[in-house]
Amino acid sequence: MAKKVIGEIKLQIAATKANPSPPVGPALGQKGVNIMEFCKAFNEKTKGMEGFNIPVIITVYADRSFTFITKQPPATDLIKKTAGVQKGSDNPLKNKVGKLTKAQVLEIVEKKMADLNTKDKEQAARIIAGSARSMGITVE
């Protein structure tokens, strides 16, 4: 018989920087999860992804055990890192803060494809390009 699921927790945590302080500690503590065990497992799994916030979905079971799934970093983080900007434009229609080439967009699509809601690479590229435009980054 499968374990009974008592909750699901969705968080975004900096890679290799999970610790018992908020927001991780309180979110896991409410469900009775061993916080340090999660932090060690998460930090180990996200080695090599430093500099990104990693979305994680934690499934908590009735016996207080847990499993977790890490996703790819948000598209905006990948776009900012590739374009070499700190943050998007405050007025994307007037102020352009960076540029991406079509090849760079396709590189982001390769990393993010599993988390997007399409299987078509061309459609995925349009999604990423739209996100970049809304941040004030031009796509050439």
Curated annotation (Swiss-Prot):
InterPro entries from the UniProt entry: Ribosomal_uL11, Ribosomal_uL11_bac-typ, Ribosomal_uL11_C, Ribosomal_uL11_C_sf, Ribosomal_uL11_CS, Ribosomal_uL11_N, Ribosomal_uL11_N_sf
Keywords from the UniProt entry: Methylation, Ribonucleoprotein, Ribosomal protein, RNA-binding, rRNA-binding
GO biological process, one term: translation
Disulfide bonds: none
A single GO molecular function term of this UniProt record: structural constituent of ribosome
Post-translational modification: One or more lysine residues are methylated.
Superkingdom of this protein's organism: Bacteria
Cellular-component GO terms for this entry: cytosolic large ribosomal subunit
SMART domains: RL11
Family named by the database record: Belongs to the universal ribosomal protein uL11 family.
Subunit note: Part of the ribosomal stalk of the 50S ribosomal subunit. Interacts with L10 and the large rRNA to form the base of the stalk. L10 forms an elongated spine to which L12 dimers bind in a sequential fashion forming a multimeric L10(L12)X complex.
PANTHER family in alphabetical order: 60S RIBOSOMAL PROTEIN L12, LARGE RIBOSOMAL SUBUNIT PROTEIN UL11M
Known role: Forms part of the ribosomal stalk which helps the ribosome interact with GTP-bound translation factors.
HAMAP family named among the record's database cross-references: Ribosomal_uL11
Name of the protein this chain belongs to: Large ribosomal subunit protein uL11
Organism, as annotated: Campylobacter hominis (strain ATCC BAA-381 / DSM 21671 / CCUG 45161 / LMG 19568 / NCTC 13146 / CH001A)
Name of the gene this protein is made from: rplK
